[in-house]
Amino acid sequence: MKKLFLSLFALLLLSFGFANRAQADEYLRIGMEAAYAPFNWTQDDDKNGAVKIEGTNQYANGYDVQIAKQVAKALGKKPLVVKTSWNGLIPALTSGKLDMIIAGMSPTAERKKEIAFSNSYYTSEPVVLVNKDGAYANAKTLKDFKGAKITSQQGVYLYNLISQLTGAKQETAMGDFAQMRQALESGVIDGYISERPEALTAESANSKFKMIQFKKGFDVNEEDATIAIGMRKNDKRLEQVNAAITKISAKDQVALMDKMIQNQPV
């Protein structure tokens, strides 16, 4: 019995050592979908400053990736992207698989119950993407979508904004924006709510799409419109991360986003 106890104790120490080593190595493991251009996407080479995706021969790039590189540099680490589904990001962070989430994530009150957030590194504007030749192509206000079948991404604040489109039909939330684009093109939906950079990306990729912006747009909480870095609550590097973000001015953020929109895959 004593030998069994000692063996188990040794195994626990060994496991603890591996966990510490994983956290203490040269890499900063960043979680993202790598499927939400221009914030993050997957590509086959390291062109335009892309970062390796762990466990694959592919690379990630986009606005989030470039922010991740600057944060990693400030922490004396090398960035390494861990491709993770949206709903799996927070569990992966809290379990220690990720060091940080840099994935276009808003610091909502609900998420703050589980993880900590840095200062904002981008502020988003919600828009609606429709078919250029569709019934809602000339929409000007939130009241111009009566009868429209509208959706957005599951688990994202954008989906809750559908109720602000007067008379619109709230369709089932979808897993990612690639699904939404396909559904829009095929006529399954009449439109979806997105953030301006993603909608611009969709327009560039498909000439059949049209982005609808509003002079008086959605009523959005500041915590939803801003995007921040997700970290574990006990991570003592938060101050360093905030210092790195502070060095990126609002002007630089806009310039970087415009550059990523140009570089994104079509």
Feature roles, as predicted:
Residues N48-G49, K132-K149:
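Flexible hinge/capping segments at coil-to-helix
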Residues A24-G104, K113:
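Extracytoplasmic small-molecule ligand-binding "clamshell" domains
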Residues Q43-G55, A68-G76, G155-D176, R181, ...:
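Ligand-binding cleft/hinge of the Venus flytrap
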Residues Y157-E171, A243-V266:
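Ligand-binding clefts/hinges and TM-proximal coupling segments of bilobed small-molecule sensing domains
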Residues Y63-V65, L80-P91, A137, T172-S186:
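Short helix-initiation/N-cap motifs at beta->coil->alpha
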Residues G88, G104-K113, L161-Q164, D190-E223:
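A ligand-binding cleft/hinge motif common to bilobed small-molecule-binding domains
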Residues R29-W41, F117-A139, I229-M231:
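Hydrophobic/proline-rich hinge and linker segments of small-molecule sensing/allosteric domains
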